[in-house]
C-alpha cells in the first residue's frame, strides 16, 4: 500500500485521531502509529505540561529560592540553545505566513502549532534564566519538558524519514531535524548540575550531602546515595563518612518553627493562663488525659509541615493514576494475546507501555515515600525538641506527676508512633478512592456480576474492623503489662544492691515473671488475631474472585471465563485487597497515634514554672537586702494544699542564714520557693543578683570533673584550682587517672557519695554568684570533711564570705557560725534570729537541740557528754584536719540514668582505688549477624516447630500456584455457544484450592507467631536469670541504661519484630518462588533474562544490607544518647534553671538530635535507593515476561500468558520486600545478640545449698568471727581489707569508724558476700558463711543503708516484700518508728501506692520506713551502714530508740560518719588502710589518744 493512506501530507488536516493504524496488517516502521495522533500529541502535550506546571513552579522557586548561580558555561549553552530554538520556531511560524501571503492555502494547525511552540520555548528559556536567579541547579520540571519534547516528535520524525518525504519538503525537514537535535541537546544538558550559588548563606560543610550536586535523574532514582552505600559495603562506616546535616533539617531550625507556632496556638486557647499550661497533677492524667489538648499542637504541626506533606500527597496521587493504568494495559495485552489475527507491533507497544507505566508509578511512589520519610524525621526532631524544652520549664508539681522514664517513653514510643502515622494519613481517603476505581473496573469487565464483589467486600470489611479492634484491645493490654514490667525492671536494676543485700531476687523475679506471663498471654492472643486478620486479607482476593466468577458463570449471558476477565479481575482484586488490608491497619495506627498525640499534647500542656514566681529585681528590696519574701504562701501544684504559709523573710547582703527544723517542716520547699519552683499562691519573692543552688541529692552530669564544675562557663584555671581545694576535692582529683578531665560517669557512678556532693558544691562556688542556696550539702560528708568544707567554703572565712548564703542543714554544730537562724515548723516560720538570741528565747531551736541531746539509750557518761559537745560546741575542738583523698568508686564504666539516691549503684567504696575511669558505653556490634545467632534463636523456637512452619509455608504456596494455574486452564477452555462446558468443575476445584491455601496460610502464620512467643519467653528468662545471678561488681561496671535496653527495647524487638519480619520474609520468599516458576513455565525463554536480573538483585541486596545494618546500629546508639541526655536533664532541671543554663543545655540536646539525624537521613535514603532500583528491575521483569509472551504468541495460550504476566506484575513488590525483610530481620537479630551478651559473664555463688536447709534456725546467737579476712573489689585493684581477725560476740553492739577509704563498708560487703573473700573467711555462730547459700545468708542479716530505698508498689509491699507479717505486726512496727499517724493520714493507708522510689516522701520518712522494714525481718544480726547520715538529729534519735527496743538482743554493726552515733556502742572498731587499727570501748579509745581520739578531735568530741 502507499504511504498516503496512513500519513497526512503537510498541507492537509487530520480528520480523525485513531491510535491504531489499521490500514495494513503488517505495516512498515513508519506505519506504527497514526500520524495525525502523533502530531496532536507531539504538538499539545509538552506545551500543556509546561504551561500548567510552569507558573506553579515559578511561584514555588520565588518563595523558596536561594542565592543566584554563577553565569556558568552550562547556563550559557542552555540559553544559546534556547534562543536557537526560538529562532527556529519563529522560522516555522513565518513560513506558513509567507505562504499565505503568497496565496498558498495552509492548514490552520501549520500556523497554530509553531506559534504555540514558539511561546512555549520562550517560556522554557525564561525558566532557565529564573532558575539561575533563584539558585536552582538541577531542574526536574525542565527535564520532564525536554523529555516529552523528544519522545513523540522523535517517532513522528522517524516515520517521516521512513516515508521518504524529505525530497518533497527538504527545508521543513531540515528545520525539524535541527529542532529535534537542539531539544535532545537541552535534554542532555538538563541531566547536568550547575555550579553552586554565587553567595552562599552558610559555610560549606566538611562532608556535604551529594543530593545538592545530583542531577534530576540521579535525584529521581536516588543514585546520588550510591557512593555511601558502596563505602559501607567496603568498610565500617564512621561519623566522618556520613553527610553533614542541611540547615532545613537541623534541630534549631525545626524546633524553633514548631515551638513558635505551638505557643501562638496555645496562647489562643480559652482559659490560657499565660505562663503555665493546663495542670495535670496525676500520672494518670499524663498517660490518659481527661480532655484533649491536641488542637494547638495539631494546628502547629500542620502549619509547619503542610507544604512537604501536600507535595508528597500529589506524588502519591500521580503514582496511583499510573497504578490503575496497569490493569487497563494488561486487559489490552490479554485481548491482543487472545486475538490470533492482531499485529505483533501492538503487543510490543503494550509491553513498552506497561513498562513505562510501572516505571512512572515507581518514580512518583518513591518520591512520595522519600518526602514522607523526611517529614517523619523532621517531625520527630521537632517534637522531641519541644518535649525537651518543656522539661526545662516543668513546675515541681508537674515533675512529681511524671518520672524520667515516663518522659523518655514519651519520646521513644509516643513520638515514634505519631511520626509513623503520617504514612497512613492518606489512607483515610485515598484507599476509598482505590475501592471505587476497582469497582468501576470490575463493572466494565464483568457487568452486574461485579455487584457481588461489593457485597463480599462489605461483608469482609466489618470482620476486619472487628478483628482490628479486638487486637487493639489486647495490644493495649500488652502495652500496659510491658509498661509495668519496664517500671519494675528499672526499679530492680537501680536498687539491685539493696535487693541483693536482702536476698530478695527470687521475690522480684517471681513478680516480674508474673507480669511477663500476662504480657505474653496478651501477645499470643494478639498474634492469633493478627493471623486471622492476615488470612482474611490474603484470602479476600480469592473469596471475592470465587463469588464473582461463580455469579458471572451462572447468571451472565456471555458467561465464558476468558483470560482477560480472569486475570485482569485478579489484578484489580489484588489492588482492592491492598485497600481492604491497609484501611483497618491505617485506622488502627491512626487511633494509636491519636492516643500518643493526646499524651504528648497533655505533657506539653502541663503546668510550667511561673516566670513571675521569683523576681530578679532590686525594686522590692532595700539596697542592703538580697532576698525578700513578703507574705509568701506556696504550694507544689494548683491542686495540692500550700506547703509554706505566711512566709516573711528578709536576708541582707553577706548574711549566712541557717535553716533548720524537723523532717517535713518545709526547709527544702523554702529553697524551691526562692528559686521560683513552687506555685506562688500569694505574696512576692525578690532576689537581687545571680543565684547558685546546691541540691540535697547531688546531681552531676556524665562528663568530666572540670565540665561539671565549670558548668558551661569559661574555664578559669586558678579559680578552678582554688574552688577544688576549698571543696576538699584537690587531693581526690589528683588521685584520679586523668585529673580534672576524668569522666565521673552517669549520675556520678565513678564517684563516692561525698565526692558527688562536694562536686555539686564546687559547681555552685565556681559560679561566683551573689546568692547561694544550699540544701544540706554537709549531710553526706564525713565529720572532718564536713568541718573543712564548712570552714573553707560556707563559713564566715570561706570562699563565699561576703555573699548571701542560705544553708538548710541538720548539722546543728554549725549553727553558732551562722549570722541568722531560721527555724521552720509545719510550713511556717517558728522563729528567726541569731544563735544566742534564739537560745535565750528558749523556743523551737532549743527544742531541736534538746532533742538532739537526748541519748538513745543507756550509754557511758563520756559518750553522752561528747554528744552534747558535738551538737553545741561548734568547731572548738580542732584545727584544720589532715585529709586523705576520698577514693572514688571502683567502676570501670559509668552507668546511665538513674536515681541519685540508692546505695545500689553507689557502694560507698570508700576503700577502693581506681586505676582508670571511663564512661560506660554500650556494646555496638559490627558486620553481619553471625549464623550462630540465628541458630540460637531457632533453637529457642524449637526444631520441630521450625520444620513444621517451613512445610506449612510450602504447602500453602503450592496451593496458591495451583490455584493460578487452574484458573489459566479455566480461561483456555473452549467456548461453545458462548459457554464453557466444565465451568462448574473448574469453579469447584478453584474454590477447593483457595480453601486449602487459606488453611495453610493461617497455620503457617500462627506457627511463626507462636514460635516467636516461645523463643521470646525463653530468651527473656535466660536474660533475666543471667542478670539476676550476676555479682554486684557486674552492676557497678555495666551502665543501668544498657541493661534497661536489653529488658525493654531489645526484648520488644524479640517479642514483636522478629516474628513479624520472619513471617514477612517467608511469605515473600515463597511467593517469589511461585512467580519465578509461573513465568518460567509459561515462557521458558524468560529464564535467560531472569538470571541477569537476579544477579543485579543480589548486588543491590549486598550493598544495601551491609550499609543499612551499620546505619541502624549507629542510629540506635545515637538515639540512646538523646534519651540519656533527656533523662539527665529531667532529673537536674531544677539545677539547670537555677544556674540559668537552659540555653547551653538546649544547644547540647539539639547537637545530639542533629547527630542522630545525620545517621537517620542516610538510612532513609538507602531505603529509597533500594526500593527505586529494585522496582525498576522488577518492572524490567514485567517487560521481559510480556515480550517473551509476544514472541511465543503462536504456541502460548492467553490463559498462560495472563498467568505469567499477572504474576510478574506482583514480582516488583515481592522482590523488594524479600530484600527489605531479610535486612530488617538481620537488624532485628542484633537484639538476640544483645540479650545474650551476659550469658558468659561471671555469676554469683548458688543462692541455696542443701546444707543450708539443714540449719533452719541459724544463726541462733549472732556471733561473728573474722579469721585473717581480706578482699579486693577487682583482681587488678589492691586489697581493700586485709588481715582482719576479730570476734564479735552475740548481742554485742559494735561501731565501725574510720576515715574515707579505710575499709568500713568492705567489711559488711564481705559479711553479706556481696564481695567474696580473697583470703581468710567469716564464721557466724561457728559456721563458715561460704557453706551457706547466698539467700540463706542474706535473709538472716538485716542491713539499713545510708540511702533509703523504696520500690514501686504499695506501702505494705515495701514493708513486707515476702508477705510474712500480719497487718497488726506492720502497724506495730510503724508505731515504733513513730510513723503510724503519718501512714494513717495517707489515702489507702498501707495500700498507698509509692511514687517511683518514694519520691513523694521526704528522706527522713523513707529512712524511717526502711527502719520499720528492718524491724519486721526479725534477724539476729543488724548492719547500719551510715543509716543516719542523711537525716536530722531528731529522726536519728527516733531510729536509735527503735533499734534499742527491737534489737536489744541482736548483734549490731554500726558504720558511722558521725562519731556521736557510736559513742554509746559497747565496742568501736577503728579501720585504717583496710585493717583494724584500734578496738575498744569509746572511753578506752579516747583515753588512748590514738586514731579514734584524733577523729573525735576533728568532730569536736574531744
Swiss-Prot record:
Record: residues binding ATP 1: 661-668
Please give a single GO biological process term from the UniProt record: transmembrane transport
Cytoplasmic compartment ranges equal 59-78, 126-137, 195-300, 369-424, 470-531, 596-938, 1018-1060, 1104-1174, 1219-1502
Residues with attached carbohydrate: 21
Q: Which residues lie on this side of the membrane: Extracellular?
A: 5-37, 100-104, 156-173, 322-347, 446-448, 553-574, 960-996, 1082, 1196-1197
Q: Which SUPFAM superfamilies match?
A: ABC transporter transmembrane region, P-loop containing nucleoside triphosphate hydrolases
> Which residue stretches belong to region Disordered?
854-909
Phosphoserine, modified sites: 891, 1285
Which residue ranges run through the membrane? Answer: 38-58, 79-99, 105-125, 138-155, 174-194, 301-321, 348-368, 425-445, 449-469, 532-552, 575-595, 939-959, 997-1017, 1061-1081, 1083-1103, 1175-1195, 1198-1218
Ordered alphabetically, the record's keywords are: ATP-binding, Cell membrane, Glycoprotein, Membrane, Nucleotide-binding, Phosphoprotein, Repeat, Translocase, Transmembrane, Transmembrane helix, Transport
GO CC annotation terms, alphabetical: apical plasma membrane; basal plasma membrane; basolateral plasma membrane; extracellular region; lateral plasma membrane; membrane; plasma membrane
GO MF terms on file? Answer: ABC-type glutathione S-conjugate transporter activity; ABC-type xenobiotic transporter activity; ATP binding; ATP hydrolysis activity; ATPase-coupled transmembrane transporter activity; inorganic diphosphate transmembrane transporter activity
Stretches assigned to coiled coil: none
User: Which reactions are catalysed by this chain?
Assistant: an S-substituted glutathione(in) + ATP + H2O = an S-substituted glutathione(out) + ADP + phosphate + H(+); leukotriene C4(in) + ATP + H2O = leukotriene C4(out) + ADP + phosphate + H(+)
Looking at the record, the residues that make up the ABC transporter domain are: 627-851, 1264-1498
Q: Which NCBIfam families match?
A: MRP_assoc_pro
Stated name of the protein: ATP-binding cassette sub-family C member 6
Q: What species is given as this protein's source?
A: Rattus norvegicus (Rat)
Amino acid at each position: 500500500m502507499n504511504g498516503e493512506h496512513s500519513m497526512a501530507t503537510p498541507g492537509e488536516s487530520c480528520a480523525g485521531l485513531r491510535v491504531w493504524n489499521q490500514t495494513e496488517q503488517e505495516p512498515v516502521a513508519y506505519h506504527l502509529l497514526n500520524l495525525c495522533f502523533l502530531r496532536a500529541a507531539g504538538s499539545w502535550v509538552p506545551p500543556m505540561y509546561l504551561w500548567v506546571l510552569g507558573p506553579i513552579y515559578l511561584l514555588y522557586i520565588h518563595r523558596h529560592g536561594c542565592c543566584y548561580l554563577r553565569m556558568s558555561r552550562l547556563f550559557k549553552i542552555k540559553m544559546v540553545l534556547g534562543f536557537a530554538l526560538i529562532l527556529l520556531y519563529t522560522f516555522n511560524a513565518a513560513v506558513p505566513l509567507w505562504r499565505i501571503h503568497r496565496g498558498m492555502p495552509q492548514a490552520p494547525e501549520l500556523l497554530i502549532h509553531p506559534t504555540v511552540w514558539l511561546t512555549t520555548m520562550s517560556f522554557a528559556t525564561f525558566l532557565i534564566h529564573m532558575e539561575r536567579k533563584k539558585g536552582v541547579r538541577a531542574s526536574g520540571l525542565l527535564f520532564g519538558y525536554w523529555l516529552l519534547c523528544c519522545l513523540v516528535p522523535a517517532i513522528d520524525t522517524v516515520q517521516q524519514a521512513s516515508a521518504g518525504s524529505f525530497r518533497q519538503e527538504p527545508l521543513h525537514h531540515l528545520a525539524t531535524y535541527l529542532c529535534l537535535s537542539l531539544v535532545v541537546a537541552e535534554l542532555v544538558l538538563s541531566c547536568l548540575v550547575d555550579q553552586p550559588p554565587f553567595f552562599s548563606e552558610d559555610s560549606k560543610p566538611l562532608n556535604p550531602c551529594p543530593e545538592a550536586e545530583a542531577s534530576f535523574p540521579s535525584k529521581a532514582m536516588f543514585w546520588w546515595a550510591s557512593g555511601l552505600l558502596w563505602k559501607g559495603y567496603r568498610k565500617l562506616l564512621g561519623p566522618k563518612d556520613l553527610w553533614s546535616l542541611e540547615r532545613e533539617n537541623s534541630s534549631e531550625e525545626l524546633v524553633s518553627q514548631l515551638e513558635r507556632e505551638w505557643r501562638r496556638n496555645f496562647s489562643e486557647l480559652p482559659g490560657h493562663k499565660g505562663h503555665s499550661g493546663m495542670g495535670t497533677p496525676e500520672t494518670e492524667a499524663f498517660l490518659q488525659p481527661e480532655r484533649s489538648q491536641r488542637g494547638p499542637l495539631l494546628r502547629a504541626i500542620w502549619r509547619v509541615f503542610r507544604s512537604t506533606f501536600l507535595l508528597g500527597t500529589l506524588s502519591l496521587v500521580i503514582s496511583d493514576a499510573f497504578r490503575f493504568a496497569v490493569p487497563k494495559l494488561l486487559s489490552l495485552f490479554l485481548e491482543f494475546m487472545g486475538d490470533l489475527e492482531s499485529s505483533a507491533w501492538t503487543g510490543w507497544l503494550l509491553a513498552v507501555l506497561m513498562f513505562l507505566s510501572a516505571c512512572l508509578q515507581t518514580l512518583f511512589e518513591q518520591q512520595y515515600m522519600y518526602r514522607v520519610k523526611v517529614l517523619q524525621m523532621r517531625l520527630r526532631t521537632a517534637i522531641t525538641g519541644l518535649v525537651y524544652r518543656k522539661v526545662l520549664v516543668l513546675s515541681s508539681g508537674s515533675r512529681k506527676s511524671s518520672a524520667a522514664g515516663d518522659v523518655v517513653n514519651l519520646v521513644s514510643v509516643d513520638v515514634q508512633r505519631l511520626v509513623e502515622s503520617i504514612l497512613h494519613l492518606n489512607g483515610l481517603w485515598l484507599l476509598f478512592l482505590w475501592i471505587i476505581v476497582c469497582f468501576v473496573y470490575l463493572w466494565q469487565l464483568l457487568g452486574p456480576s461485579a455487584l457481588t464483589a461489593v457485597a463480599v467486600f462489605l461483608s469482609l470489611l466489618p470482620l476486619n474492623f472487628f478483628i482490628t479492634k479486638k487486637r487493639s484491645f489486647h495490644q493495649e493490654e500488652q502495652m500496659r503489662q510491658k509498661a509495668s514490667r519496664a517500671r519494675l525492671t528499672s526499679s530492680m536494676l537501680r536498687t539491685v544492691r539493696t535487693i541483693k543485700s536482702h536476698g530478695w531476687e527470687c521475690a522480684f523475679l517471681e513478680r516480674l515473671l508474673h507480669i511477663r506471663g500476662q504480657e505474653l498471654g496478651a501477645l499470643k492472643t494478639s498474634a492469633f488475631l493478627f493471623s486471622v486478620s492476615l488470612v482474611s486479607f490474603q484470602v479476600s482476593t480469592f473469596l471475592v474472585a470465587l463469588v464473582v466468577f461463580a455469579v458471572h458463570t451462572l447468571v451472565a449471558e456471555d458467561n465464558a471465563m476468558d483470560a482477560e476477565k480472569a486475570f485482569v479481575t485478579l489484578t484489580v482484586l489484588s489492588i482492592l485487597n491492598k485497600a481492604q488490608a491497609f484501611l483497618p491497619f491505617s485506622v488502627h495506627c491512626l487511633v494509636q497515634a491519636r492516643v500518643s498525640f493526646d499524651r504528648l499534647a497533655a505533657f506539653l500542656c502541663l503546668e510550667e514554672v511561673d516566670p513571675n514566681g521569683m523576681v530578679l529585681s532590686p525594686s522590692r528590696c532595700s539596697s542592703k537586702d538580697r532576698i525578700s519574701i513578703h507574705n509568701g504562701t506556696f504550694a507544689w501544684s494548683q491542686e495540692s494544699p500550700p506547703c509554706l504559709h505566711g512566709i516573711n523573710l528578709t536576708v541582707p547582703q553577706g548574711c549566712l542564714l541557717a535553716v533548720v527544723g524537723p523532717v517535713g517542716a518545709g526547709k527544702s520547699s523554702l529553697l524551691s520557693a526562692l528559686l521560683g519552683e513552687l506555685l506562688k499562691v500569694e505574696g512576692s519573692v525578690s532576689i537581687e543578683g545571680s543565684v547558685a543552688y546546691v541540691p540535697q541529692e547531688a546531681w552531676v552530669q556524665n562528663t568530666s570533673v572540670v565540665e561539671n564544675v565549670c558548668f558551661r562557663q569559661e574555664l578559669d584555671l586558678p579559680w578552678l584550682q582554688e574552688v577544688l581545694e576549698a571543696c576538699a576535692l584537690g587531693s581526690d582529683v589528683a588521685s584520679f587517672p586523668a585529673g580534672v578531665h576524668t569522666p565521673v560517669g552517669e549520675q556520678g557512678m565513678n564517684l563516692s557519695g561525698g565526692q558527688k556532693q562536694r562536686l555539686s558544691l564546687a559547681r555552685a562556688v565556681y559560679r561566683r554568684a551573689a546568692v547561694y542556696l544550699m540544701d544540706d550539702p554537709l549531710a553526706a560528708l564525713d565529720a572532718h570533711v564536713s568541718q573543712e568544707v564548712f570552714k573553707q567554703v560556707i563559713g564566715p572565712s570561706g570562699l563565699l564570705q561576703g555573699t548571701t548564703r542560705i544553708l538548710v542543714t541538720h548539722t546543728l554544730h554549725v549553727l553558732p557560725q551562722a549570722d541568722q537562724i531560721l527555724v521552720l515548723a509545719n510550713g511556717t516560720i517558728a522563729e528567726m534570729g541569731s544563735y544566742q538570741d534564739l537560745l535565750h528565747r528558749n523556743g523551737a531551736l532549743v527544742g531541736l537541740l534538746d532533742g538532739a541531746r537526748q541519748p538513745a539509750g543507756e550509754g557511758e557518761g563520756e559518750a553522752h557528754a561528747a554528744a552534747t559537745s558535738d551538737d553545741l560546741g561548734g568547731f572548738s575542738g580542732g584545727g584544720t584536719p589532715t585529709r586523705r583523698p576520698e577514693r572514688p568508686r571502683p567502676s570501670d564504666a559509668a552507668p546511665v540514668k538513674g536515681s541519685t539516691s540508692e546505695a545500689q549503684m553507689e557502694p560507698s567504696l570508700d576503700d577502693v582505688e581506681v586505676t582508670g575511669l571511663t564512661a560506660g558505653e554500650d556494646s555496638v556490634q559490627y558486620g553481619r549477624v553471625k549464623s550462630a545467632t540465628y541458630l540460637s534463636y531457632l533453637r529457642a523456637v524449637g526444631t520441630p516447630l521450625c520444620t513444621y512452619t517451613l512445610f506449612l509455608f510450602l504447602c500453602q504456596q503450592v496451593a496458591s500456584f495451583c490455584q493460578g494455574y487452574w484458573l489459566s486452564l479455566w480461561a483456555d477452555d473452549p467456548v461453545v455457544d458462548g459457554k464453557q462446558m466444565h465451568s462448574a468443575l473448574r469453579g469447584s476445584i478453584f474454590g477447593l484450592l483457595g480453601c486449602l491455601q487459606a488453611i495453610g496460610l493461617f497455620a503457617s502464620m500462627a506457627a511463626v507467631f507462636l514460635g516467636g512467643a516461645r523463643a521470646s519467653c525463653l530468651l527473656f528468662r535466660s536474660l533475666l536469670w543471667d542478670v539476676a545471678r550476676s555479682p554486684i561488681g557486674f552492676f557497678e561496671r555495666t551502665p543501668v541504661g544498657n541493661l534497661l535496653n536489653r529488658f525493654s527495647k531489645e526484648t520488644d524487638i524479640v517479642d514483636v519484630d522478629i516474628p513479624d519480619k520472619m513471617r514477612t520474609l517467608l511469605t515473600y520468599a515463597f511467593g517469589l518462588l511461585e512467580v519465578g516458576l509461573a513465568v518460567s513455565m509459561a515462557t521458558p525463554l524468560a529464564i535467560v533474562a531472569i538470571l541477569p536480573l537476579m544477579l543485579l538483585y543480589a548486588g543491590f541486596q549486598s550493598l544495601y544490607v551491609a550499609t543499612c545494618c551499620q546505619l541502624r546500629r549507629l542510629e540506635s546508639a545515637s538515639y540512646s544518647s538523646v534519651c540519656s541526655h533527656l533523662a539527665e536533664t529531667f532529673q537536674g532541671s531544677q539545677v539547670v534553671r537555677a544556674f540559668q543554663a537552659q540555653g547551653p543545655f538546649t544547644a547540647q540536646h539539639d547537637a545530639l538530635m542533629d547527630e542522630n539525624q545525620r545517621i537517620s537521613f542516610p538510612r532513609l535514603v538507602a531505603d529509597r535507593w533500594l526500593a527505586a532500583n529494585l522496582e525498576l528491575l522488577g518492572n524490567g521483569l514485567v517487560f521481559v515476561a510480556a515480550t517473551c509472551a509476544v514472541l511465543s504468541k503462536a504456541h502460548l495460550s492467553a490463559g498462560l500468558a495472563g498467568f505469567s504476566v499477572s504474576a510478574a506484575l506482583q514480582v516488583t513488590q515481592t522482590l523488594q520486600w524479600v530484600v527489605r525483610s531479610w535486612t530488617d530481620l538481620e537488624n532485628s537479630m542484633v537484639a538476640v545478640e544483645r540479650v545474650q551478651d551476659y550469658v558468659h559473664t561471671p555469676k554469683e555463688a548458688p543462692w541455696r545449698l542443701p546444707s543450708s536447709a539443714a540449719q533452719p534456725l541459724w544463726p541462733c546467737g549472732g556471733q561473728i568471727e573474722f579469721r585473717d579476712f581480706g578482699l579486693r573489689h577487682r583482681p587488678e585493684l589492691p586489697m581493700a581489707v586485709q588481715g582482719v581477725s576479730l570476734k564479735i560476740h552475740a548481742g554485742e553492739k559494735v561501731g565501725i569508724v574510720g576515715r574515707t577509704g579505710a575499709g568500713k563498708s568492705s567489711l559488711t560487703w564481705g559479711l553479706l558476700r556481696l564481695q567474696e573473700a580473697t583470703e581468710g573467711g567469716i564464721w557466724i555462730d561457728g559456721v563458715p558463711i561460704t557453706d551457706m547459700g547466698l539467700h540463706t545468708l542474706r535473709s538472716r542479716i538485716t542491713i539499713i543503708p545510708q540511702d533509703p530505698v523504696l520500690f514501686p508498689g504499695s506501702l505494705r509491699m515495701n514493708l513486707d516484700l515476702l508477705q510474712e507479717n500480719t497487718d497488726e505486726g506492720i502497724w506495730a512496727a510503724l508505731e515504733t518508728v513513730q510513723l503510724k499517724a503519718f501512714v494513717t493520714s495517707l489515702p489507702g493507708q498501707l495500700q498507698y501506692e509509692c511514687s517511683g522510689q518514694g519520691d513523694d516522701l521526704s528522706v527522713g520518712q523513707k529512712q524511717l520506713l526502711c527502719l520499720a522494714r528492718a524491724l519486721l525481718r526479725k534477724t539476729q544480726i543488724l548492719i547500719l551502714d551510715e543509716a543516719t547520715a542523711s537525716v536530722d538529729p531528731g529522726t536519728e534519735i527516733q531510729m536509735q530508740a527503735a533499734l534499742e527496743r527491737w534489737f536489744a538482743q541482736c548483734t549490731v554493726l554500726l558504720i558511722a560518719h558521725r562519731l556521736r552515733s557510736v559513742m554509746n556502742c559497747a565496742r568501736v572498731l577503728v579501720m585504717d588502710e583496710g585493717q583494724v587499727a584500734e578496738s575498744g570501748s569509746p572511753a578506752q579509745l579516747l583515753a588512748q589518744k590514738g586514731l579514734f581520739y584524733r577523729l573525735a578531735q576533728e568532730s569536736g568530741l574531744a
